[in-house]
Amino acid sequence: MAKRQLNRRQNWRIEKIQGERAARAAKREQHVLQELEGGDLGPEQLGLVIAHFGVQVEVEAQDGEAAGQVFRCHLRANLPALVTGDRVVWRAGNQGIGVIVAQMPRSTELCRPNNHGQLKPVAANVDLIVIVFAPAPEPHPNLIDRYLVAAEHAGIRPLLLLNKADLINEENAPTLNAMLEVYRNLGYPLLEVSAHQGDGMQRLQQMLDGHISVFVGQSGVGKSSLVNSLLPDAGTRVGDLSEWSGQGTHTTTTARLYHFPNGGDLIDSPGIREFGLGHVSRDDVEDGFIEFRELIGNCRFRDCKHDREPGCALLKALEDGQVSQQRMSSYRSIIASLPEDSY
């Protein structure tokens, strides 16, 4: 069934109602904050944001007698937007409720544009981004490459994870193996696992230990199943593939941070079908394709668009087999999706 198109007046009315609701929620939140800060608050202490629920977050105490305990906290209005993985300074109040008073500097942040083109942080202080895909739904190199560019741009090390390896068969193996070979040749770490059968899961756990990781990938690739296998007590709800579309149904509703027994953390984020890169420039995209780095700057023309220009180093590398057609197609698709002012 086709999605109903809204006219300008309907969109305006929806935004007006949402704005009024947000204003009422903010007013209620401010009243709660005033009551909390007017009472007895404990000393400032360090905390870790492990989940975000709109105007409130769950914070795990990092020091003191309450270390390891989780508190629901309100945010002061002057704070920037917080995300799972943020390190904060907070003060405990009554009845297990606290107030966040400061945000600690982030070592990294993973961002994506929202529907209005504004940057929205997804997770903070991550040092490993696990890009999950599977034989079904059919993996798209373009989406994988978008994640890789985002990881390179954010300075976060990527790990390519093929889940549902038990679904590889004679029909899909040739295409899948050809796609994987491209990434192996580029030197990207790649692991094949099956959360359902347990194959490769021990190796995955070893690769995650000691890192703050985030799982990304389109819906239906088994991110929640992976979390349930790695952390049986997490209780992440699992969704099936939609029979009609073959795409996954979104199950995780908020990003949450989990601890591994041997050290390291995992942030399980909602399924993302299309990872936008509107916040990066053409230069950022070119730098995100690691095999392009030694070639960029060697073209005959400084403003080369790597399309049909004579003396293009990228086109020559493509012709010689140094750059794969798969990656070149992804690059062109990503560049075409950028706003014109990013050129």
Curated annotation (Swiss-Prot):
Q: CP-type G domain: from which residue to which, for each copy?
A: 116-275
Entry note: cofactor: Binds 1 zinc ion per subunit.
Q: Which Pfam families match?
A: RsgA_GTPase
Q: Which terms are listed as keywords in the entry?
A: Cytoplasm, GTP-binding, Hydrolase, Metal-binding, Nucleotide-binding, Ribosome biogenesis, RNA-binding, rRNA-binding, Zinc
One Gene Ontology BP term is: ribosomal small subunit biogenesis
Concerning its family, UniProt says: Belongs to the TRAFAC class YlqF/YawG GTPase family. RsgA subfamily.
Any idea what job this protein has?
One of several proteins that assist in the late maturation steps of the functional core of the 30S ribosomal subunit. Helps release RbfA from mature subunits. May play a role in the assembly of ribosomal proteins into the subunit. Circularly permuted GTPase that catalyzes slow GTP hydrolysis, GTPase activity is stimulated by the 30S ribosomal subunit.
Q: What is this protein's name? A: Small ribosomal subunit biogenesis GTPase RsgA
